[in-house]
Design a protein with these regions (language model features):
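Small-residue-rich segments of transmembrane alpha-helices in multi-pass membrane proteins
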Residues: 14-20, 70-73, 132-149, 198, ...
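Intramembrane alpha-helical segments
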Residues: 79-149
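Multi-pass membrane catalytic core of lipid/isoprenoid biosynthesis enzymes
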Residues: 66-106, 196-220
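Membrane-embedded alpha-helical segments that form the functional core of polytopic membrane enzymes
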Residues: 17-58, 65-66, 90-94, 105-117, ...
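Cytosolic, membrane-interface loops and tails of multi-pass inner-membrane proteins
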Residues: 56-77, 173-201
């Protein structure tokens, strides 16, 4: 049970959501077999890698007040038990991915490589840009969901993945601001810890522009997602105003508000991704 807690159920649900959205956006059917296998891949691969990440970071978790209650630092689970549980989840997830097709298995392998050895073990304690490698791991469920439906990964899948990738800085950096004393105490050089608030705001804005460009480009390429984009754009503009104001106030409440705005923006954009819009109807009529 504690191993399942280590999968970060809320984060797992969000990443699994991106996988299923990509699956249906790619034209995936309601096949119980594929949908069931994708669920096993999500729980096993995403959840297992997340749990393994907690094993690798258990020393940091013990230092930071925000994470000190997690199963390993709180003593509810030994490091060895957590490691075994994580590896079992990953093995099951990878086996399900291999049953679907080799591309889905590849996305799982890449998620593991980018998340554990590259992000967590190599860069997180050394570099402020470590989340870029973590972000690559974060887009793999989207690519895996698309590959589950089609057996291939094309431009639309990469545009959806780019939206997830460019959403991650707003999601992560403002969590860091909210708990910045924890990160300083643990000696983790996240970008908000070592850079000026103005630099972080500019960088976050650049990524937000990429997110908007990628979701709107997805609509132009596929004719899908217009309603989601129309609803998501004003939320992003509102978030942008808060981000640009943040350096003036450096307020924890505002940091939390920005972080909480990030998730709905991505959710709304992705909810519309599988659905055709008048754009595709107009193109059909003009042919």
């Amino acid at each position: 049970m504690y191993v399942l807690e280590m999968t970060k159920p809320a984060q797992l649900a969000l990443l699994a959501f991106t996988a299923y959205v990509a699956y249906f956006a790619a034209g995936g059917s309601l096949s119980p077999t594929k949908l069931g296998l994708l669920a096993v891949v999500s729980l096993g691969s995403i959840g297992g890698v997340t749990a393994l990440n907690m094993v690798a970071e258990s020393d940091l978790d013990a230092i930071m007040r925000r994470t000190s209650g997690r199963p390993i630092p709180s003593g509810r689970l030994s490091r060895r038990e957590a490691l075994v549980g994580s590896l079992i989840l990953i093995t099951v997830g990878f086996a399900a991915a291999a049953i679907i097709n080799w591309l889905v298995l590849l996305t799982c392998l890449l998620a593991l490589v980018f998340d554990i050895p590259l992000y967590t073990m190599l860069l997180k304690r050394r570099s402020p840009v470590s989340i870029l490698l973590g972000g690559v791991a974060g887009v793999m469920p989207t690519l895996g969901g698309w590959a589950t439906a089609t057996g291939s990964i094309g431009l639309p899948a990469f545009l959806l993945a780019l939206a997830v990738f460019s959403w991650i800085p707003m999601h992560i950096w403002f969590i860091v601001y909210y708990y910045i004393d924890d990160y300083r105490k643990a000696g983790v050089p996240m970008y908000p810890v070592i850079a000026s608030p103005q630099s972080v705001a500019r960088a976050t804005m650049a990524f937000l522009l990429v997110m908007l460009a990628s979701t709107w480009s997805y609509w132009l390429v596929t004719g899908k997602g217009l309603i989601g984009n129309v609803l998501m754009t004003p939320i992003t503009i509102w978030a942008s105003k808060m981000i640009l104001s943040y350096p003036k106030f450096m307020d924890r409440t505002m940091a939390k508000r920005i972080f909480l705005t990030a998730n709905p923006a991505l959710l709304i954009a992705f909810l519309g991704a599988p659905f055709s819009t008048p754009h595709v109807i107009a193109c059909t009529l003009l042919r």
